[in-house]
Amino acid sequence: MSGFIHLNVASAFSGHFGVTRPERMVEAAAAQGIQAAAITDRDGLYGAVKHIGACLQLGISPIVGVNLAVLDDSGNQLGRCVILAHGNNGGLGWAKLCKIVSVAHALPKAIKKRVGIARSALADLLRDEGGCTVLLGPDSDVGLEVLAANRSGAIEALEAWRECLKTPGTLAIEIVSHITEPGTELSVLQARRMLQLADATKTPAVLTNAVRYLEPDDALTADVLDSARHLEALGLFKPQPNAQAWLKPAISM
């Protein structure tokens, strides 16, 4: 079994979050026999050029996206999502992705400390030609409702997204399990419920591993980065539950 393509991968260019440089991630993907590799840094396209260059050098297809916070029109958080650019369309997907990131960094002064995009603005950018796919994963508003075992709330949240993103191919549910304790974020239970929601609503679903590092041992470095991001000493904030957020081979996925 080979060729699993990871579609949610943060590199070391995701400040205080990702661990591994894009080039090393791409090398590992190529070594696994994967024909394409994605990068989805948080809040920007910071590692995209390095990623694309490494992919072209090794003869595999680059996939580029971004992990962004989403806001409602009042500036309230709707969780985070992954946005992937479509390829083979004359650069439309890349152009849309660049516009999305630019809008995310141009929030009104009242919420300027955040990087994020209003769902209505995202919908406007993807309304006609599409060009990107939005993945709603465990830390989206849909995923958080699923985590709370609020099925009606999850369906309502998903319907709000479907109302905004009506262009075919612009919306999918992201299934992630880091084998955490049942009932907690990134658990098998949450992943199963997300898949059930996708099936019930006829929404496409994709499996990812929400990758932060290359190998399990790199989780220690991720803990240090989390400490810097939270501005808290280790032990004073909720840590990673385990070391599962690595670039797993297909058999492990």
Set out the residue ranges of the language-model regions.
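Phosphodiester-processing cores and adjacent nucleic acid-binding clamps
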Residues: 1-253
